[in-house]
Amino acid sequence: MVDEKAEVIKKFRTADNDTGSAFVQVALFTRRINNLTRHLQGFKKDYSSRLGLLKIISKRRRLLNYLAKNDCQGCKNLMEMLDIRK
């Protein structure tokens, strides 16, 4: 799990020591969303995980809105790379 996170950070960072930019955060949220979605397909009545998933989706949406305002082309590229639909 830590290795996957490090790979995501390495792939989406903008500088060598960048771990918290909006691009990296969106990528990490997307990874967590995919993992929780897979979990919820097997455990349909896990309502606390479902609530956590909705919170993460909201955080990712707010970051994407920020990126759309400040770096429109970067946001579009990120959404294509992560296969996120608007």
Curated annotation (Swiss-Prot):
Superkingdom assignment: Bacteria
Cellular component aspect of the GO annotation: cytosolic small ribosomal subunit
One annotated GO molecular function: rRNA binding
Gene3D superfamilies: 6.10.250.3130, S15/NS1, RNA-binding
InterPro entries linked: Ribosomal_uS15, Ribosomal_uS15_bac-type, uS15_NS1_RNA-bd_sf
Record keywords, A-Z: Ribonucleoprotein, Ribosomal protein, RNA-binding, rRNA-binding
A single BP term in Gene Ontology: translation
Oligomer and partners: Part of the 30S ribosomal subunit. Forms a bridge to the 50S subunit in the 70S ribosome, contacting the 23S rRNA.
Function field: One of the primary rRNA binding proteins, it binds directly to 16S rRNA where it helps nucleate assembly of the platform of the 30S subunit by binding and bridging several RNA helices of the 16S rRNA. Forms an intersubunit bridge (bridge B4) with the 23S rRNA of the 50S subunit in the ribosome.
Similarity comment: Belongs to the universal ribosomal protein uS15 family.
Name of this protein: Small ribosomal subunit protein uS15
Organism name: Neorickettsia sennetsu (strain ATCC VR-367 / Miyayama) (Ehrlichia sennetsu)
Lineage, opening ranks: Bacteria, Pseudomonadati, Pseudomonadota, Alphaproteobacteria, Rickettsiales
Gene name, Swiss-Prot/TrEMBL: rpsO
